[in-house]
Amino acid sequence: MKRRYFILPALLLMLFSACGDDENNYQIGGKKGEDTPVQPDDRQSEGPEIAKYNLEFPALKGGKSVVVVHYGVYNDRLNKSGYNYAVEWDSEIRAQRWSCYQMYEDNYKSGAQVTRYNAKNDGSLSPECQYPNDPDLPESYRLTADPYKGSGFDHGHICPSADRQRAVEANYQTFYITNMQPQNNKFNAGIWQDMENQVRKWANNFDTLYVCKGGTIDKSDWILRYLGSGNNKIPVPKYFFMAVLGKKGSNFKATGFWIAQDSYTATTLQSYAVTIQALQKNTGIDFFCNLPDDIENEVENIPLSQMEKEWTWFK
């Protein structure tokens, strides 16, 4: 049974000053002084503390999967640092299952825009290359060579670089190889980019946007092929998804995207819009599980036609 909590501004200050790194930065949305309901899911007990409270986290897979949480400076002008984003990495499949993150005033909207990280793409995975290894991932789980290089597939960002352009460090962290999935260029630079632009426009209409995105890696018929070999062999997902939860004041609403990167035809984003309930059935992932049950059931089970009316579509 899940227990319900309300994260209050005063409690947030206590958490920030008294807890360890994983417990520091519950960046809860909503207007100043307003409670945000949180009902931690028991399935989060083996993960980092932040996964028990932050609403963007789905239910953790467990087993041979680990959750890596990235912290750093997220706004250079305001000199603010804390939680950036998190990723679930399957050490057996050697691929990421999802990245999750938040978009709100200080980490997305305000402050000067920094230049996108750009370095030599030599496939070395060194800290100085374009797609470095994740320093927070246990060394035994890391790739030793970049399987994307020469494959014809793009390094497809899951937490986008463009969503983290208020600080050099936060932007650099989005280039970790753990935040990538293989995408063909037409998809990555086309409709996937359109979906990311759509999410960014939505972020301007909410106090906080909670986002979880990824590609399918858990079933053979969800995988197009593999890149690399040996310990550097990674799957190419057939399907990609986005789960988006918006909070404004005390109100929540949610939507999702589900798309096959090799066989999509429609160019309108609404063609790929799905309810969270449908997305959960498609992916096997339980999204927004830290919401209280009544709110979770309401936002996840809304009829598709009603969901489409509640969101503003820009393409």
Which residues fall in each region the model found?
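Positively charged n-region of N-terminal signal peptides that target proteins for export
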Residues: 1-5
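Sec-dependent N-terminal signal peptides
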Residues: 6-11
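C-terminal motif of bacterial Sec signal peptides marking the signal peptidase cleavage site
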Residues: 15-18
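Domain-level detector for secreted/extracellular nuclease and nuclease-toxin modules, and
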Residues: 20-315
